[in-house]
Amino acid sequence: MGLIVLGISFIVMISNLVGGSALVYLSSRKPLVSLLLVSYVWSVFSALFMGFVLWYFQLVPAHFVAWTIGIGFLECLFSIHNQVFIGQENWKIHNLLKLVQKIVQLVVFLLLGITLHHFVLALVASYLVSLLWSFFALKDSIRFEGNIQFVSVFKTSFVYGFQIQLSNIVQLLNYRLIYFIIEKSMGGVLGIYIVAVQLAESLWIPSKALAIIQYGKISNEIESRKKSELTVSFIHLSFLLTTLALIVLWMIPNEWVLGLFGKDISGTKPIIYALSLGVMSVALSQSFSHYLSGVGRYKQLLIAALVGLIPILFFGKYAVTTYGLVGAGMITSVSYAFSCGYLGVVFYRLSGLSLKEILVLKTGFLETFKLLK
């Protein structure tokens, strides 16, 4: 089951070079027909190319390769449509589609019986139902006007998509490179650190949800200053929610953590404290990075990820060997803070706002919450 899911994720990763989150930005700037056609053709290539790789290197059981290719293609289409809905700020359809897909998958899986073959069938059924609905939801938005801009749209989509995917890969190193350093330096205590990280990273859920809404709004906003002011509102809201979530996490008794994860997982609290600056930095970075995505400055995301990688590359081993798991949390926080700082400076330079306008929220939080509609 895990190999099939991994194979599907590889197909989607290649597809996202053209049909990924860049569609949110481009959906209000390029003809939708051209965007969809380019994304569909690229998703076919992604499924066939990655399917061949999976088969040739035997990364997926041979009798499930065709299923993996098919499901991967369906998930690519599903992802493409969802990115377009975000770009259209059609949150109702976007959220319902994701919910329906999961519900259908679970129901079919339970009805057929819990086997690997039935898991595959459940995935197929869930994506077919969701895709059928998404096609109907999109049909009114499609307008056939003039020639299909295949080549120009492909070039633009690929350049943006490549920058996004490359920054995601570097950011993944920022998130997880410290794991390898801990494993090499300290051995069996990695599990304790991973639990602390999972607890801390769960606090990113609100900021990530807010950032997706922000991305859609900024991509459709014409006035530059309004884009900046929207971002400031989301920054303050993300800061508030993350602060509250951090306080709650700090107050959770250590006994609860031991009861949930086992008595061997002790000493997570100091690590969580060390990660707190990093948690807040990533929460704020979500708003900065989605502003830059909304104005088409994807290259800055890659630079920010590389800036964040510097502390871990140069000081990661020293922090772990000298201060243990707390040191790992500290250097991780420094890494995230470096990225956040860079993104903040870029936002300040592009926004046209004064430092006071960024730091002081003009409207109340109740007014800011209305932006979520």
Regions flagged by a language model, labelled:
Residues 8, 12-30, 200-225, 291-294:
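Helix-loop junctions and terminal segments of transmembrane helices
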Residues 19-30, 74-97, 219, 277-306:
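Membrane-interface junctions at transmembrane-helix termini in multi-pass inner-membrane proteins
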Residues 2, 28-44, 158, 225-240, ...:
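Interfacial transmembrane-helix starts/ends
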